[in-house]
Amino acid sequence: MIEDTMTLLSLLGRIMRYFLLRPETLFLLCISLALWSYFFHTDEVKTIVKSSRDAVKMVKGKVAEIMQNDRLGGLDVLEAEFSKTWEFKSHNVAVYSIQGRRDHMEDRFEVLTDLANKTHPSIFGIFDGHGGETAAEYVKSRLPEALKQHLQDYEKDKENSVLTYQTILEQQILSIDREMLEKLTVSYDEAGTTCLIALLSDKDLTVANVGDSRGVLCDKDGNAIPLSHDHKPYQLKERKRIKRAGGFISFNGSWRVQGILAMSRSLGDYPLKNLNVVIPDPDILTFDLDKLQPEFMILASDGLWDAFSNEEAVRFIKERLDEPHFGAKSIVLQSFYRGCPDNITVMVVKFRNSSKTEEH
């Protein structure tokens, strides 16, 4: 009896293997189940299919909108990807800043104005940190306020002062670097930052730059006028200075001082400062506003300039000055959309002679 039972079970097992579990049989079984589900549960299946189709259409529509919309109104769908955003708006100046694809936000910016009393020129600053946010935050929180105090003192007795906007800028930038280096060295913090500062008075625009943040101005004819020049290791002047100091530059994705830093001047960076291969000395330029009759200026971290040329950025903003952020938000989003991996900060300042703006 037991032998007969075992024989029967063995036969059933062979039937299962050779007939029911054959690929053709399983395929027909799946088709049969699908047809049965459709005809006997029509409403549920049709709802699932319709929802899937609607979802696909929505995604395709959003992608097409992003690809075709030059003004980037449809890019709000991407904003969920930004871990953090910052923005600032005050009648003639707008700032938009995103952390973007980086794990940390190391960009900082500052705006200090006194349009009512005009006790000092307007102060605009961009600080792009590296190696952590310590240096950028330190400079942002101290340098603009220090400039404000010294500029107010200067304005009270300008006629008798031997100082100028240029000398005040240079003195305060170098002073903040020395002060910060003392603190960073004690804590072994190797952070550094760029420093782009613009002083805007009634007749002049004075711009100081350390590093590779950049300023560009749009003049009355729509031309892009550089307000600063990047400090890069591959530039002949910088390369010679680094070599004289006993340093070197090497290529690792970009030209770097001692194979480390992708700019030749910065604030902070105490290990490279100790070698004197990276310096904090600013380049300072002054522009005659009556001569240029500018419409606006752009101050930005290198996240923008990795995606836009000076001329392209000016054209882009010029077409969007009527937007709430004067085009700053749109150009930041466009830089992100073009694949920029960095933090991106853009400040747009409209001048008094530009449309819908009556004063600095």
Curated annotation (Swiss-Prot):
Spans traversing the lipid bilayer: 26-42
Broad class of the protein's primary localization: membrane
UniProt xrefs under InterPro entries: PP2C, PP2C_BS, PPM-type-like_dom_sf, PPM-type_phosphatase-like_dom
Residue ranges annotated as Extracellular topological domain: 1-25
GO cellular component term of the entry, any: membrane
Entry EC number(s): 3.1.3.16
Domain of life: Eukaryota
Gene Ontology molecular function, alphabetical: metal ion binding; protein serine/threonine phosphatase activity
GO biological process: cell surface receptor protein serine/threonine kinase signaling pathway; MAPK cascade
Annotated effect of mutating residue 302 to A: Abolishes phosphatase activity, prevents MAP3K7/TAK1 phosphorylation in vitro, does not abolish interaction with MAP3K7/TAK1, found in a complex with MAP3K7/TAK1, MAP2K4 or MAP2K6 and enhances the association between MAP3K7/TAK1, MAP2K4 or MAP2K6
Domain PPM-type phosphatase, residue spans: 92-351
UniProt topological domain (Cytoplasmic) ranges: 43-360
Entry keywords, A to Z: Hydrolase, Magnesium, Manganese, Membrane, Metal-binding, Protein phosphatase, Transmembrane, Transmembrane helix
Location of the protein in the cell: Membrane
Expression tissues: Expressed in brain, heart, testis, liver, lung and skeletal muscle.
Catalyzed reactions: O-phospho-L-seryl-[protein] + H2O = L-seryl-[protein] + phosphate; O-phospho-L-threonyl-[protein] + H2O = L-threonyl-[protein] + phosphate
Binding site for Mn(2+) 2: 128, 302, 342
Disruption phenotype: Mice exhibit increased fat mass and higher plasma glucose levels compared to wild type mice. Male mice also exhibit a decrease in free fatty acids and higher blood pressure.
A Pfam cross-reference name: PP2C
Obligatory cofactor(s): Mg(2+); Mn(2+)
Membrane topology: Single-pass type I membrane protein
Family: Belongs to the PP2C family.
Protein purpose: Acts as a suppressor of the SAPK signaling pathways by associating with and dephosphorylating MAP3K7/TAK1 and MAP3K5, and by attenuating the association between MAP3K7/TAK1 and MAP2K4 or MAP2K6.
PANTHER family xref list: PROTEIN PHOSPHATASE (PTHR47992)
Protein name: Protein phosphatase 1L
